[in-house]
C-alpha cells in the first residue's frame, strides 16, 4: 500500500533476500513439517530483530537499567509488537543517550489459523477481509506523544503479510471471540514507512484533502475510521502539521500548516 500524500511517502527499500534469511534463521525452512507447536511465541519480533541486525552480537544489550533489542553502541533499535505504553520508561532512559528507532509491525494482509489445544490440530487458513495501513500506528504513537518531538526518536512502520495463529480458547460458543493469539508468522515484507523528523508526518495528510476539512472528511480521504482520523489529527496538530481553525457545526475544522524548510 502507498499513502498518496502532499509530501510523498518516505519509505526504505526492502531487502527481500535479507528478510528471507531472517525468516529462515528464526522459523526454519522445514517449519511446515515440524508443525506450529515448535515455533517461538514471538516470531515476528525475532524475525524483524534479525532483519534489522543480522549480527546477534548486538542483540539484547544492557543499556541503563534496561535491555535494548538492538544496540551497536551508536544507536538503539526497539522492535515493539505490542502497546507503546510499555516503551515510556525505556524511552526516558534511552533518548538522552542514543538515537532510538522503534520498529512497529503492522499486518497488511493476514491469514487466520485456529489451533485446537486439546487435539493439537490446526485449521486451514482463512484470509482476513481487513487490511492494515500505516495510520494504525497512530493509536500507539498517542501513548508516547510526550516523546514525539524528540529529535533522537525515529519510527519504522513495517507493513507485513502474515499468518496469525490463535488458540480456540475464547468465551463464545465457537471459542473464537476472546481467544488468545498464539503467534504471528511474517510471510512477506511489503513496505516500510519512515518517520525521522517532524516534516515526515506530512506524508499522512492525504493528497486529495480539501483546503479546510473535518475529521470525517480526513477519514474519507485516508480510508480510515473517523475515530482513528481524530487520533491522527490530534497528533498531527501537536506536531504542527495541521491546525484547528474553528468549527463547522459541532466538528473541528482543520487546515494544513505551511512547512518551512
Regions found by a protein language model. Name each.
Residues 48, 68-83, 87, 94, ...:
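Conserved catalytic cores of phosphodiester-cleaving nucleases, focusing on short active-site segments
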Residues 247-261:
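Short, cationic-aromatic polyanion-contact patches
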Residues 124-196:
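Long, low-complexity, charged/polar intrinsically disordered regions in eukaryotic proteins
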Residues 224-237:
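Short amphipathic alpha-helical interaction segments
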Residues 237-247:
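A short, conserved structural fragment
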Residues 2-67:
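Acidic-basic catalytic patches of nuclease active cores, encompassing PD-(D/E)XK
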Residues 89-151:
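A basic- and aromatic-enriched beta-loop-alpha substructure that forms the phosphate/nucleotide-
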Residues 209-221:
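Short acidic, hydrophobic short linear motifs in intrinsically disordered regions
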